[in-house]
């Protein structure tokens, strides 16, 4: 299926690129999220009119992501959770808890920007967690997981 990208898509292309993808990828991901439109003659003409506007919006998003990355550089955040005497957590810490801790510290982060590809955190300790703020911008933050003070 031939599409025109409306924004930069990792491992696929930039704004305005005409790409050929499998129909399922187009139907289930690119089209519903507004990342692409079918490459019909009407859409091609319409896109050429809007190209400057879309590129300006993309540049603004990139600048905002870089500014947020600069704020997050060399920062560490502390999260407390119930843990056993051996340091195993009762439960786990996932993207939602990490995003909430960073947001409470004053920097807006969405849970979808937290990249816990290695799985949720289940032990007390310090972890380097990558944040993907934009397709071109990522930053690592330190997350310190500490046990809550409890009488167990």
UniProtKB/Swiss-Prot annotation:
Pfam families referenced in this protein's UniProt entry, alphabetically: Ribosomal_L9_C (PF03948), Ribosomal_L9_N (PF01281)
Transmembrane segments: none
Gene3D superfamilies to which the protein is assigned, alphabetical: Ribosomal protein L9, C-terminal domain, Ribosomal protein L9, N-terminal domain
Keyword Signal: no
Gene Ontology biological-process entries: translation
An example Gene Ontology molecular-function term: structural constituent of ribosome
Entry's Gene Ontology cellular component terms: cytosolic large ribosomal subunit
Keywords: Ribonucleoprotein, Ribosomal protein, RNA-binding, rRNA-binding
InterPro entries reported in the protein's UniProt record: Ribosomal_bL9 (IPR000244), Ribosomal_bL9/RNase_H1_N (IPR009027), Ribosomal_bL9_bac/chp (IPR020594), Ribosomal_bL9_C (IPR020069), Ribosomal_bL9_C_sf (IPR036791), Ribosomal_bL9_N (IPR020070), Ribosomal_bL9_N_sf (IPR036935)
Similarity-based family: Belongs to the bacterial ribosomal protein bL9 family.
Function: Binds to the 23S rRNA.
PANTHER family associated with the record: 50S RIBOSOMAL PROTEIN L9 (PTHR21368)
Protein name in the entry: Large ribosomal subunit protein bL9
Provenance organism: Coxiella burnetii (strain RSA 493 / Nine Mile phase I)
